């Protein structure tokens, strides 16, 4: 099975801190990232799907409720682009 090395963007770091301040269950996000880094598919509950338009080439999965993770797989890297609510990620 192919594994990926996580690569974090500056926006993702800011998003992550915002989620922590909101006291969201960060272990849920970390679990999803761990699954993706192992090269495994996420369960259906994550509603993992490709994005289009400005985000073409990226994927989005739902961590819980309105909480999403936007990522991209490139070569051996899992690029963590954004995380937060839909408004946080797609309205800026």
Regions found by a protein language model. Give the residues of each.
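A short, surface-exposed loop/turn module that caps and links secondary-structure elements
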Residues: 35-62
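Enriched for short, Lys/Arg-rich terminal
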Residues: 1-5, 11-17, 21-27, 31, ...
């Amino acid at each position: 099975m192919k594994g990926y090395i996580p690569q974090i963007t500056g926006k993702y770091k800011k998003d992550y801190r915002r989620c922590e301040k909101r006291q969201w269950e960060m272990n849920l996000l970390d679990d999803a990232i761990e699954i993706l880094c192992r090269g495994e598919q996420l369960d259906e509950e994550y509603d993992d799907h490709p994005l289009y338009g400005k985000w073409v080439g990226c994927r989005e999965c739902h961590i819980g409720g309105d909480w999403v993770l936007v990522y991209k797989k490139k070569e051996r890297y899992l690029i963590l682009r954004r995380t937060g609510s839909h408004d946080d990620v797609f309205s800026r």
